[in-house]
Design a protein with these regions (language model features):
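Intrinsically disordered, charged and Pro/Gly-enriched terminal/linker segments
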Residues: 1-173
Length: 173
């Protein structure tokens, strides 16, 4: 332990925590080091998926604002990493891995429009059109019933392009 004034810190030369490993993996994935191949990036995403056990615990007493911010930060980093891995897996034509990673992202951010679009695109490429319809319809239902809103125009266009088989329309993932 290191102390400075009223602050306390962990000496990273002697202690490694799961959050430190998470941050290091997320940094490597999101910053896309030049010497990292697509397969290495996918492996890093799968390790991150294994490491991430869900949203950070938020205590139910005292000032919890720090924990709430950290929870949101880690969740966003996780989803962004899964999205990056899914896109790389698609580029490598590895649909099972792309599907695994996008499903992990959907579990953590079921209302994020970019995740919905990417999931629809991956499901469509894998021939899972029924799942595209179910995902989109459930997304629309939640938005209309709970948030009194509609999907973003890009999401609507992506869905229509998949359903109508219009490959000329760019699927915005």
């Amino acid at each position: 332990m290191l102390t400075q004034g009223e602050g306390v810190a962990i000496n990273t030369e002697y202690v490694v925590s799961d959050t430190m490993r998470f941050d290091a993996l997320a940094r490597d994935i999101l910053l896309g080091r030049a010497r990292t191949t697509g397969r290495q990036l996918i492996e890093a995403c799968l390790r991150l998926d294994e490491l991430y056990t869900g949203p950070l615990y938020v205590p139910n007493f005292g000032d919890t604002s720090f924990y709430v911010r950290q929870r949101r930060l880690y969740q966003t980093k996780f989803v962004d990493c899964m999205m990056r891995g899914a896109h790389v897996a698609l580029e490598l034509d590895d649909l099972p891995v792309a599907s695994w990673l996008i499903d992990a992202a959907l579990r953590q951010a079921p209302l994020r429009e970019d995740v919905i679009r990417a999931a629809m695109h991956i499901y469509d490429k894998g021939g899972r059109r029924r799942e595209v319809v179910e995902l989109y319809n459930s997304h629309v239902h939640v938005l209309e019933q709970e948030l009194h809103s509609l999907p973003e125009r890009e999401t609507q266009m992506a869905y229509e392009a998949i359903i109508h088989g219009d490959r000329e329309v760019e699927l915005l993932a």
